């Protein structure tokens, strides 16, 4: 089957992403999303396995350690990439109700590839580890796998080292041992250790990790109890604490003290605060969660370090995202909000890719398309969660509440409801179980969140006393885990959360820690940026049922998931739109075979060609659209075209195969015919041979022919021996001649070398003289430049002084303006002070009125108390009225107490305002005097400085006139020096020209010396070659003589002679081959010898048995000797030519020497005259320089004087500037003081307003109390009249009984009266 006909497969998606990355050079990402248990982690592992096989750089190597099949092989990096998952699963996965291997964290695996497609590294980022699972989990669930692996798989020695116990001994393993079907914890423990070893974890690191895991379990066994008489917590048994401290390397006493009585910084003081049992338990649980989280982060960084150790550069990457899907539980907390927020962002990316970008491409390509709104805009829900302000979202409000004093989860929800109550995606549940609940409408449905403990989770507080201990642990691994303790929220910061004296608590200061929400939001933002910069490939994992059963499909559940994640809408747009598209050039190239005759020959635009092809294919116009750069098709059209193309290609291939088979059959037939003809020829030849083999003359001919060939070969060998002897003698003579020639040439070479050394010394002396003249010229030029620079500096100084005079005048004018401004400000401050005095007097009068009202209320209170005592001692039938009077009395007493406290506060505020008024008056007087003194002193100083500056200006004018005169003298001297310098330059140029001519002559001589040297080397090489050839010729001659004697002695043994001749022929061939590097004549001789050897072989075979060939061989050898003698004559003539060339070179050398001597003489004469003239010029210049030096000294003295004066002026100006700055500072201080006084006056006004409000309130309460008092007086008068009419005899006992009843009633209804008093006070407060 073809790929598009196959059902979807995770390998196909991974392969598509991998191929797209290589072809398009674009980064890819694979997003695995879905519910818990849907298979996200398994699909992620399958993708990594596939890429490790396809993109491995060790495909040809065998590796038996980790193989997924008989043909799979991985390199070290690929093995580590595969083994990263088991480690992360052991520490980050757990068994839940829905999934036996549920990932309790999200991860983004980034695999880097080089330009060839091989894996060069990887990196893993994690999100939202559910660290709370380390301390508690639901029923029938497990905590992280590593705890069970460690207890089940540790051996005896490890159990003793890590202080391990059974499953039921640990509080954090509340459900005990919960097995997982088809998984053994002890085997998984060994697999985890092996994976760590492959990742490069040392044994010490593995043991340190397991120690931390064991310490987390032991933390859960620490038990606290509440002491009897106090709320303070105590630790009756510290066995578990001792085990924890032993495992993490800290002192148990310090650990216990840090938990039970930690040190907290309050202001500048450090105090010890006793913790309650609940606080101690919370600290231990927070420490366990933080320890496990830090361990997980350390393992992740260690894994990333192992995966990124290669130094090869990554060209592109493929990212795999495995993150928790949308979660709706019975109780949804902060973790669920973060997970659902992440899924909202991912779903928005999916919608944007599938719907928005798809339809935008239709519009961009100019296709007629009505934009379809699929109703999947998730931006409102995302803004509800992440919006920073106007109005702030959930995360921003949570961060704000974390820093707000006395903030609670309830206040956070209330503020959220007030800010976002009208948001379409926010709802408040109708039936509230708790005041910390709210609802958000996500794309997958409405989710009810419970904000309980959200502030704590967002702050993630820890006991900083314990973290400091862990940071200083004796165990290096533990200390490394806790190295960043400065970013921890400590107990003192949490204590400040409950104080009201924290005005700036809602603002996060620079350098302080960042909340969990902030960090996760930034991390998610980086992830989304990475995903947007890649080409996404979505893998939607669908869970078939919630029962973990295979083969069962819950249709409603599957459809709900497809609806929530946008798959149904994606199918809809695929059906309505044109999901398949292909660029014009590719469409033409691929499907032109279907319309071969539709496109004419020659160039044609790609779009026009595609239109012609579509017409030829007769496609329905509803099935395609032609855009600007692509052609779009509906679903299935391209597949149909692909099938037709396959059929067409099949027909073409079949026709091609038929032609090939016909050609091969015809070729085989022709070959068969040729074989038949050849067999007939062979048959005829065999018949002829059978007739000849019995003929006697034929037998004689076959026996005689080999003897003739052998005799001819012997003759050729003899001739060759004689020729070689002659060559040997000639070569010896040539060798002697060349040796003498080489000796003569070596002597000439030595003589020339000595002459060259002498010339070199002379050249160096002349170069030194020239350099000396050049230095003298440069020194004079430098002195001249210095004088010019000094003149420019003097001009600059004068101009600077003039500018400073102008600036000083401007400063004086500015100072006068500032002094006038200060006077105006002083007047305004005095006016404000007088206004505040009047306000303070009005406040004092208001206070006196309040005191009088207070005294009047106290008198009224005393009167009421006396009347109450009389009424209590009255008759028992008035007990009920007395009880009501007692209640009103208590209410009045509470009112009196409140009024008394308010009066005390008013008195304190009045006293504070009086103190502020006095301070203001004192400050105003001091400022006034200071301003007047400063202004007077400044005016005097300015006048004095103005006079000094005028005097200095006159002095500068006189000095400037002197400077102008000196400048004119210096200009004249400069012109004179420039003329002298030009003369020196002309003389130096002539010397340079002479020097260059000498250098040219010297270079010519050096070139001739090199030629002589080259010729001498050639002669030596030829001599060595001749020596070598002569030795070889001697050897050859000796061998040929021996062969000649042997042939003369035994001519009858023809066969043996032929073999010896063959051997000698091979030796001669080797010797001739070794002489390939000889001269041209010897090479010609070699070729002739090879031809002779071939001829000897032929003659030896033809003339075998011929005894007379011996004389012919001798004659031929004589001829060969004559030829060698001729060649020797030519060699001698060549040697004579070489000798004559050498003599000619010697003559040229002598001529050049004579020319060199003449040139040297001329150069010396020129140099002597030039040096004499230059010396005279130098003496003259030295005199001029001395005169100029004296003038320069005088000028420097004047400059020093002027510098001193200038420094004094500058110091004075600097003093003036400092004084101005001081005045500005004083003015600023005065402004700040005035502002402070204004603020104090405003505060005093606010206090007075508040006092007036309190006074009006007290007046109203006093009026009410007066009215109630009058009512009570009327009631008392009525009771007195009743008492007078009563019976006198029964008055005493009834009064006693009534008194007792009144007392009992009072005691019994005390709580009721308190409740009514509180209601009364609340009513007053609301009024």
Swiss-Prot record:
Tell what the record comments on domains.
Answer: The rodlike tail sequence is highly repetitive, showing cycles of a 28-residue repeat pattern composed of 4 heptapeptides, characteristic for alpha-helical coiled coils. Limited proteolysis of myosin heavy chain produces 1 light meromyosin (LMM) and 1 heavy meromyosin (HMM). HMM can be further cleaved into 2 globular subfragments (S1) and 1 rod-shaped subfragment (S2).
Where does the record place the region C-terminal?
1290-1327
A GO cellular component entry from the record = cytoplasm
* Chain ranges of the Myosin motor domain: 1-646
Q: Write out the ranges of the annotated region (Actin-binding).
A: 524-546, 625-639
Where is there biased composition of kind Basic and acidic residues?
A: 1222-1231
Q: Which residues carry this modification: Phosphothreonine?
A: 1306
What name does UniProt use for this protein?
Myosin-11
Coiled-coil features, chain-numbered ranges = 707-1289
Expression across tissues: Both isoform 1 and isoform 2 are detected in small and large intestine, uterus, bladder, aorta, stomach, and at much lower levels in lung. All three isoforms are coexpressed in smooth muscle. Isoform 2 predominates in most of the smooth muscles tested, with the exception of intestine and urinary bladder, which show greater expression of isoform 1.
Q: Where is the composition biased (Polar residues)?
A: 1127-1143
The residues that hold ATP are 34-41
List GO molecular-function terms, semicolon-separated.
actin filament binding; ATP binding; calmodulin binding; cytoskeletal motor activity; microfilament motor activity; structural constituent of muscle
Role noted for this protein: Muscle contraction.
Q: Which GO terms describe its biological process?
A: actin filament organization; cardiac muscle cell development; elastic fiber assembly; smooth muscle contraction
Among InterPro entries, the record links this protein to: Kinesin_motor_dom_sf, Myosin_head_motor_dom-like, Myosin_tail, P-loop_NTPase
Give the record's family classification: Belongs to the TRAFAC class myosin-kinesin ATPase superfamily. Myosin family.
Q: Which residues carry this modification: Phosphoserine?
A: 1039, 1077, 1309, 1326
Which gene specifies this protein's sequence? Myh11
Question: What does the UniProt keyword field contain?
Answer: Actin-binding, ATP-binding, Calmodulin-binding, Coiled coil, Cytoplasm, Motor protein, Muscle protein, Myosin, Nucleotide-binding, Phosphoprotein, Thick filament
């Amino acid at each position: 089957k073809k790929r598009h006909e196959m059902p979807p497969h995770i390998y196909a998606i991974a392969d598509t992403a991998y191929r797209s990355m290589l072809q398009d050079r674009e980064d890819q990402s694979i997003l695995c999303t879905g519910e818990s248990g849907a298979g996200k982690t398994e699909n992620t592992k399958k993708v990594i396995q596939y890429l490790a096989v396809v993109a491995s750089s060790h495909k040809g190597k065998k590796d038996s350690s980790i193989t997924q099949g008989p043909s799979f092989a991985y390199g070290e990096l690929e093995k580590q990439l595969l083994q990263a998952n088991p480690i992360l699963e052991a520490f980050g996965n757990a068994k839940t109700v829905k999934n036996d291997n549920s990932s309790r964290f999200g991860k983004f695996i980034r695999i880097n590839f080089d330009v060839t497609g091989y894996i060069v590294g990887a990196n893993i980022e994690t999100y939202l580890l559910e660290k709370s699972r380390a301390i508690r989990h639901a029923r029938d669930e497990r905590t992280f796998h590593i705890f069970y692996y460690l207890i089940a798989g540790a051996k005896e020695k490890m159990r003793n080292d890590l202080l391990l116990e059974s499953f039921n001994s640990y509080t954090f393993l509340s459900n005990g041992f919960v097995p997982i079907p088809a998984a053994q914890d002890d085997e998984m423990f060994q697999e985890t250790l092996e994976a760590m070893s492959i990742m490069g974890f040392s044994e010490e690191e593995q043991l340190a990790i397991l120690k931390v895991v064991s310490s987390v379990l032991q933390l859960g066994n620490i038990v606290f109890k509440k002491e009897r008489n106090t709320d303070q917590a105590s630790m009756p048994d510290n066995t578990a604490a001792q085990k924890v401290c032993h495992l993490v390397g800290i002192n148990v006493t310090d650990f216990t003290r840090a938990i039970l009585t930690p040190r907290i910084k309050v202001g500048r003081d450090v105090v010890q605060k006793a913790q309650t049992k609940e606080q101690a338990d919370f600290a231990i649980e927070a420490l366990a969660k933080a320890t496990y989280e830090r361990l997980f982060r350390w393992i992740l960084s260690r894994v990333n370090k192992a995966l990124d150790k290669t130094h090869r550069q990554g060209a592109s990457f493929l990212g795999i995202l495995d993150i928790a899907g949308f979660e709706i539980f019975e109780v949804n907390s902060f973790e669920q909000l973060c997970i659902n927020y992440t899924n909202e962002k991912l779903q928005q990316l999916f919608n944007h890719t599938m719907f928005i970008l798809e339809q935008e491409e239709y519009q961009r390509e100019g296709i007629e398309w009505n934009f379809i709104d699929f109703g999947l805009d998730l931006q409102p829900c995302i803004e509800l969660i992440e919006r920073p302000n106007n109005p702030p979202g959930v995360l921003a409000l949570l961060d704000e509440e974390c820093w707000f004093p006395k903030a609670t989860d309830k206040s956070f929800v209330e503020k959220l409801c007030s800010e976002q109550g009208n948001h379409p995606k926010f709802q408040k549940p109708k039936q509230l179980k708790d005041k910390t609940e709210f609802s958000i409408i996500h794309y997958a449905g409405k989710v009810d969140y419970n904000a309980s403990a959200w502030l704590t989770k967002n702050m993630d507080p820890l006991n900083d006393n314990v973290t400091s201990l862990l940071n200083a642990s004796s165990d290096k691994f533990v200390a490394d885990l806790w190295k960043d303790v400065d970013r921890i929220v400590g107990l003192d910061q949490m204590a400040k959360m409950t104080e009201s004296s924290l005005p700036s608590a809602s603002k996060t200061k620079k350098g302080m820690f960042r909340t969990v929400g902030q960090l996760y939001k930034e991390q998610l933002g980086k992830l989304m940026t990475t995903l947007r910069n890649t080409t996404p490939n979505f893998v939607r994992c669908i869970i078939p049922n919630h029962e973990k059963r295979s083969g069962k499909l819950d249709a409603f559940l599957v459809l709900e998931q497809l609806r929530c994640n946008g798959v149904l809408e994606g199918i809809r747009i695929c059906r309505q739109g044109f999901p398949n598209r292909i660029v014009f050039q590719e469409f033409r190239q691929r499907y032109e075979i279907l319309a071969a005759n539709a496109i004419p020959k020659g160039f044609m635009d790609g779009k026009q060609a595609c239109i012609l092809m579509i017409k030829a294919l007769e496609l329905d116009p509803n099935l395609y659209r032609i855009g600007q750069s692509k052609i779009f098709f509906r679903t299935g059209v391209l597949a149909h075209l692909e099938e037709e193309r396959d059929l067409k290609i099949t027909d073409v291939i079949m026709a091609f195969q038929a032609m090939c088979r016909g050609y091969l059959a015809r070729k085989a037939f022709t070959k068969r015919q040729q074989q038949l003809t050849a067999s007939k020829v062979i048959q005829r030849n065999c018949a002829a041979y059978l007739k000849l083999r019995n003929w006697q003359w034929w037998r004689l001919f076959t026996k005689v022919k080999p003897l003739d060939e052998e005799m001819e070969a012997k003759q050729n060998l003899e001739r060759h021996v004689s020729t070689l002897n002659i060559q040997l003698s000639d070569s010896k003579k040539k060798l002697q001649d060349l040796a003498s020639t080489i000796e003569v040439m070596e002597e000439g070479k030595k003589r020339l070398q000595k002459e060259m050394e002498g010339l070199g010394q002379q050249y160096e002396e002349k170069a030194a003289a020239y350099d000396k003249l050049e230095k003298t010229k440069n020194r004079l030029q430098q002195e001249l430049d210095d004088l010019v620079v000094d003149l420019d500096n003097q001009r600059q100084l004068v101009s600077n002084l003039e500018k400073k005079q102008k600036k000083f005048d401007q400063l004086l004018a500015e100072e006068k303006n500032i002094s006038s401004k200060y006077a105006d400000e002083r007047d305004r401050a005095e006016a404000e002070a007088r206004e505040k005095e009047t306000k303070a007097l009005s406040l004092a009068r208001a206070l006196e009125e309040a005191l009088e009202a207070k005294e009047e209320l106290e008198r009224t209170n005393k009167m009421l108390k006396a009347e109450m005592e009389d009424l209590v001692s009255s008759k028992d039938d008035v007990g009920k009225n007395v009880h009501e009077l007692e209640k009103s009395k208590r209410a009045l007493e509470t009112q009196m107490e409140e009024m008394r406290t308010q009066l005390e506060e008013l008195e304190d505020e009045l006293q504070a305002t009086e103190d502020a008024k006095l301070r203001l008056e004192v400050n105003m007087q001091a400022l006034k005097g200071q301003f007047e003194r400063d202004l007077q002193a400044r005016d005097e100083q300015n006048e004095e400085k103005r006079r000094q500056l005028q005097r200095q200006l006159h002095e500068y004018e006189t000095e400037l006139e002197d400077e102008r005169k000196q400048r004119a003298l210096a200009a004249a001297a400069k012109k004179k020096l420039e003329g002298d310098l030009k003369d020196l330059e002309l003389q130096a140029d002539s010397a340079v020209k002479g020097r260059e001519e000498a250098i040219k002559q010297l270079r010519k001589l050096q070139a001739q010396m090199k030629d002589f040297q080259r010729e001498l080397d050639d002669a030596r090489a030829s001599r060595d070659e001749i020596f070598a050839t002569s030795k070889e010729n001697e050897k050859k001659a000796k061998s040929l003589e021996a062969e000649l004697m042997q042939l003369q002695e035994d001519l009858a043994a023809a066969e043996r002679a032929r073999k010896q001749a063959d051997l000698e022929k091979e030796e001669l061939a080797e010797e001739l081959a070794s002489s390939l590097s000889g001269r041209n004549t010897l090479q010609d001789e070699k070729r002739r010898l090879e031809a002779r050897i071939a001829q000897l072989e032929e003659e030896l075979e033809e003339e075998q048995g011929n005894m007379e060939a011996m004389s012919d061989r001798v004659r031929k050898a004589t001829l060969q000797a004559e030829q060698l003698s001729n060649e020797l004559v030519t060699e001698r003539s060549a040697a004579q030519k070489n000798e004559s060339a050498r003599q000619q070179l010697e003559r040229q050398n002598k001529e050049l020497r004579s020319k060199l001597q003449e040139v040297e003489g001329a150069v010396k004469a020129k140099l002597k005259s030039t040096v004499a003239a230059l010396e005279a010029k130098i003496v003259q210049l030295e005199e001029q320089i001395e005169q100029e030096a004296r003038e320069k000294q005088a000028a420097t003295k004047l400059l020093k004087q002027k510098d001193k004066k200038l420094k004094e002026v500058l110091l004075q100006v600097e003093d003036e500037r400092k004084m101005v700055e001081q005045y500005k500072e004083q003015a600023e201080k005065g402004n700040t003081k005035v502002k402070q006084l204004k603020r104090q006056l405003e505060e005093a006004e606010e206090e007075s307003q508040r006092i007036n409000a309190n006074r009006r309130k007290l007046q109203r309460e006093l009026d009410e109390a007066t009215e109630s008092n009058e009512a009570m007086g009327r009631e008392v008068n009525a009771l007195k009249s009743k008492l007078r009419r009563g019976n006198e005899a029964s008055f005493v006992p009834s009064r006693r009984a009534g008194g007792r009843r009144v007392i009992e009633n009072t005691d019994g209804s005390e709580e009721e009266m308190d409740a009514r008093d509180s209601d009364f006070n609340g009513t007053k407060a609301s009024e």
